[in-house]
Amino acid sequence: MLLLPEVRAVHDSGATCVWAMTDCRVIATVLQETGPVDQIDDQQREALHLGLGVLEREVVERITDFNDPKQEWRRLFSEFMGTFFLVLVAAGGAMMGAAFDGSIGRAAAVAAPGLMVMAMILFMGKVSGAHFNPAVSFAFALRGDFPWKRVPGYVVAQLLGAVAAAAFLQAVIGVSASQGANYPAESSTATAAFLMELVLTFGLVSVILGTASGAQNIGIIGALGVGSYIALAGLWASPISGASMNPIRTLGPDIVGNDYTAYWVYLAGPLLGAALAVVAALVLRGYGGGKDGSLAAQGDLYTDFKRPDKS
């Protein structure tokens, strides 16, 4: 990263071009202004930060506009769209099974959400971080990889996506969206379902934090680990709680179907499990996921690094 004090030192010496090493790459930043660095405008400052001074002004304008924090709507739309498709598959499998008896087996119904999450992470992970789950947003913020100020917007976008998917399914399939919600098994208890959701979400968020942390970061291929975990957890744990691991995945169909039976299980379990996963990550790796953790949590738009010094 090219720091402004370094730019000032070279600029004050009368030079018009600055070379700096960034991640073993040489970046040339041309100073167009002859006045003090403190007088450069926001766009020029952003260009210096991104090492874009050698590019044409039109290109710089497009890139800095895309990185402008005012463009938060890109992230929010990504969360809305990703959650929509997640709930479309997760709730849709059960609703299809209810409408067309025997058309979808349990294994297919619980594995499909994992595959969809994998696809959505590969598709939109670089835009928003591909949370699609308030428990994930909460965990990233708690660990310091994601700004708390963005959490409410993400949760609202996720909720709207879940409700839209549930409403679409109910209108198209013709059965109540409550058929696609999660409930404790009749042969079990709400407490057992709560404990199952807690443990399953603890594992899920641990996988997410682990694949997004410093030396453990494996980039967008972390989608394979996350999607596989969701599918495997659903295959063996769904008979007790439905293996939701996501408060919004359950709340969307609950709202449309107007049935909130034992919803506390699917709110408290995942959030507590996510918090425990952050504690486990702290024990295993220390505080924060570093630059890689921030990039994974926030996507590649304007990113605020909480711990840029952490490898």
Predicted regions and their residues:
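Membrane-interface helix-loop junctions and terminal tails of multi-pass membrane proteins
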Residues: 34, 39-311
